[in-house]
Design a protein with these regions (language model features):
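Non-catalytic accessory regions flanking glycosidase/transglycosidase catalytic cores in CAZymes
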Residues: 1-155, 160-192
Length: 192
């Protein structure tokens, strides 16, 4: 997801790290951001209209485009432009309508199928409140309306990491099970 919105993501490995002669520096800290700060960098959004990228992607043959990951868990879908690029409280990233249309155009151009995961963070709900589809509805509806429906979905990425992934504070495995079930009931009912 960070490739689409831009943002902090993993640095490319150095040749020395690949060769095993340079260590990966994991910092000390209370949270994952502090621990991995030296292994990450800020990236601009990728240009999904780049002809070379599209040509190379087409050469793969039948493919799935997965727009997911830990960053998806914390992304707000600002399809009506109300945020003006400012991240709402409880989220970490903003996806604009133009960025999502870029994904849909890319998927269409290369003849791929689309798989996503959805927001499940403090901006959407607290741990003691059930997940609700307010954000998911935006992205599923726009995709369907645009003619590139979402073919596959996972509720969230890396549920084994709970709060480090971006889930609400105090979120438990039981909360995840509850919310994943709610997501799939909603999905089957509205976007079978």
């Amino acid at each position: 997801f960070a490739e689409v919105t831009g943002g902090t993501f993993w640095k490319a490995y150095t040749p020395e790290q690949i060769a095993g002669t340079e260590p990966f520096q994991v910092g000390k800290g209370e949270n994952i951001t502090d621990m991995y700060k030296d292994l990450m960098q800020v990236y601009a959004p990728i240009n999904l209209y780049d002809e070379k990228l599209r040509k190379l992607a087409k050469e793969l043959g039948t493919a799935w485009v997965r727009v997911s990951g830990t960053w998806a868990t914390k992304t707000y879908y600002d399809f009506d432009g109300t945020c003006n690029g400012k991240v709402p409280e409880g989220y970490l990233n903003v996806l604009t309508k133009e960025q999502w249309i870029g994904v849909l155009d890319f998927v269409k151009a290369i003849g791929a199928k689309l798989m996503i995961s959805v927001a499940n963070c403090p901006g959407l709900h607290s741990a003691d409140e059930p997940w609700h589809p307010a954000e998911a509805e935006k992205i599923f509806a726009l995709s369907k309306e645009y003619g590139v429906p979402i073919d596959g979905a996972e509720f969230a990425n890396e549920p084994n990491m709970m709060e480090e992934t971006g889930f609400p504070h105090g979120y438990t495995a039981a909360d995840y099970r509850r919310d994943q079930d709610l997501f799939f009931v909603w999905l089957r009912k509205n976007y079978p």
